[in-house]
């Protein structure tokens, strides 16, 4: 059967000069010939994409189609042709917000308030549409045009994810080092609050021209962030109003559940009553510091783009030392996006949830156990005498009549775990479980079982859909 190749982009659009270049894509000005309308085309070479990269590209296009807001760069079309994919966006000609600020003759706290208000409006729209950006930083804050008072536009949804309501889950280690939240660094479940943390970092920079967390050594930088170790040093912060500092404190709150939301931040007096609360004094020191900050960002960005351009899109076929191959390892990566969802990290995640499941079993915690199991879970285990068990009722019996009554210490060890990743949302783990316990007479015993568990991720949460346990029926392991 003949394959029909799409040529719609080639037929409808004419390409012009290059506007920007990433490691794996190029952005060029284009014109829709019949309408005479200008756009920016992000061109991705799909020949270099893995199946995983294709999924990410589809996710980005799907998310961008959802978002329609004056402070977000709009996606107008998404076209796939042989060897290339084209994302057709608004043509924004004003450049980066931070570059525009340093060219201004006058810049005050009130101007910073107006900037962060527009960023928060964009973030609020994202969150209302169930989208978390995950990569808010100066490079992704653009201006619609060169005209004075042009709108701030949020760009680059390459790392954005879809979430349900206020859902918190582990979506992978992703973002830009200096803007990462404590919960991401702790590898805790996360959600919309990560964007507000990044807004806090951006607002801090908007007011003084340098970031709240900074260290050339990435490990020390991450320690600072996890500890929330920032301050408002003299003399530059002495002229900043208490209300501005209060908003930063509310954004840079370590506990994500206590962190201010986008809707709440927009109601903060420093934003909602800008004309009477925010200072109008010109901040020359901020402009001078911001010039240095911009120069440092550009230099480091250029170095990393050059490094990354030599790698495959997935970074998996470079042939280099894998340990040093990721951007994550580089101290030069403070302003460069990373997405550390490589095989090693994902396998560690499966081991972690398996350990949590076994801990729930050892503690006789049926409630936690059920949260980690699909309601229709199937199982082969010795206690079922060769029968396939479906659902949780069979397992409930052991929790109610054995585990809940066992007050003696139990120690479990997982040996030789082998994990098979089956796409983004499924994984299989096989291992030997050694269980040490005290029998009825108080004598230490050891039991062994060979187990295979199949995990499936739904709405960001891993659940067991099937398991198989070998060995003789035993008193404790389940």
Curated annotation (Swiss-Prot):
GO terms for cellular component: calcium- and calmodulin-dependent protein kinase complex; dendritic spine; mitochondrion; postsynaptic density; Schaffer collateral - CA1 synapse; synapse. It is found in: Synapse; Postsynaptic density; Cell projection, Dendritic spine; Cell projection, Dendrite. Activated by Ca(2+)/calmodulin. Binding of calmodulin results in conformational change that relieves intrasteric autoinhibition and allows autophosphorylation of Thr-286 which turns the kinase in a constitutively active form and confers to the kinase a Ca(2+)-independent activity. Residues 290-300 are annotated as: Calmodulin-binding. Keywords: ATP-binding, Calmodulin-binding, Cell projection, Cytoplasm, Kinase, Lipoprotein, Magnesium, Metal-binding, Nucleotide-binding, Palmitate, Phosphoprotein, Serine/threonine-protein kinase, Synapse, Transferase. It catalyses: L-seryl-[protein] + ATP = O-phospho-L-seryl-[protein] + ADP + H(+); L-threonyl-[protein] + ATP = O-phospho-L-threonyl-[protein] + ADP + H(+). The modification Phosphotyrosine is found at residue 13. GO terms for molecular function: ATP binding; calcium/calmodulin-dependent protein kinase activity; calmodulin binding; glutamate receptor binding; metal ion binding; protein serine kinase activity; protein serine/threonine kinase activity. PANTHER family: SERINE/THREONINE-PROTEIN KINASE. This is Calcium/calmodulin-dependent protein kinase type II subunit alpha. It comes from Mus musculus (Mouse). The lineage of its organism: Eukaryota, Metazoa, Chordata, Craniata, Vertebrata.
């Amino acid at each position: 059967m003949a394959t029909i190749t799409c040529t719609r982009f080639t037929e409808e659009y004419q390409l012009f000069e290059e506007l920007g270049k990433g490691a794996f894509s190029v952005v060029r000005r284009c014109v829709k010939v019949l309408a005479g309308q200008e756009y920016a085309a992000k061109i991705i070479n799909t020949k270099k994409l893995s199946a995983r990269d294709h999924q990410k590209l589809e996710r980005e296009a799907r998310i961008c189609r959802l978002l329609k807001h004056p402070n977000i760069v709009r996606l107008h079309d998404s076209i796939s042709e042989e060897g290339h994919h084209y994302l057709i966006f608004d043509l924004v000609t004003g450049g980066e917000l931070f570059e525009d600020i340093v060219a201004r003759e006058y810049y005050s706290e009130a101007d910073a308030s107006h900037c962060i208000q527009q960023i928060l409006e964009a973030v609020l729209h994202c969150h209302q549409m169930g989208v978390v950006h995950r990569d808010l930083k100066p490079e992704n804050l653009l201006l619609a045009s060169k005209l004075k008072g042009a709108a701030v536009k949020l760009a680059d949804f390459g790392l954005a994810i879809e979430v349900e309501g206020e859902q918190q889950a582990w979506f992978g280690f992703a973002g830009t080092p200096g803007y990462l939240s404590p919960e991401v660094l702790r590898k805790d479940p996360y959600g919309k609050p990560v964007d507000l943390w990044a807004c806090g970092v951006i607002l801090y920079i908007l007011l003084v021209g340098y970031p709240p967390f900074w260290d050339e050594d990435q490990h020390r930088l991450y320690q600072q962030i996890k500890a929330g170790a920032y301050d408002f040093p003299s003399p530059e912060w002495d002229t900043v109003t208490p209300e501005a500092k209060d908003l930063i404190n509310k954004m840079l709150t370590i506990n994500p559940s206590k962190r201010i939301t986008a809707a709440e931040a927009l109601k903060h007096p420093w934003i909602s009553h800008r004309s009477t609360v925010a200072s109008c004094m010109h901040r020359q020191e901020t402009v001078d510091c911001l010039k240095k900050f911009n120069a440092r960002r550009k230099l480091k960005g250029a170095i990393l783009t050059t490094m990354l351009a030599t790698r495959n899109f997935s970074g998996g076929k470079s042939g280099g030392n894998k340990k040093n191959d990721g951007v994550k390892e580089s101290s030069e990566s403070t302003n460069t996006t990373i997405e550390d969802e490589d095989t090693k990290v994902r396998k560690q995640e499966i081991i972690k949830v398996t350990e949590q499941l076994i801990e729930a079993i050892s503690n006789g915690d049926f409630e936690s156990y059920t949260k980690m199991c699909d309601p229709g879970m199937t199982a082969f285990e010795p206690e079922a005498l060769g029968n396939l068990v479906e659902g949780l009722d069979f397992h409930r019996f052991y929790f109610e009549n054995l585990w809940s009554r066992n007050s003696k210490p139990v120690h479990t060890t997982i040996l030789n775990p082998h994990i098979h990743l089956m796409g983004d949302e499924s994984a299989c783990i096989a291992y030997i479980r050694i269980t040490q316990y005290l029998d009825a007479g108080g004598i230490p015993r050891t039991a062994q079982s060979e187990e295979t568990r199949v995990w499936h991720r739904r709405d960001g949460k891993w659940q067991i859909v099937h398991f198989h346990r070998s060995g003789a029926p035993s008193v404790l392991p389940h």
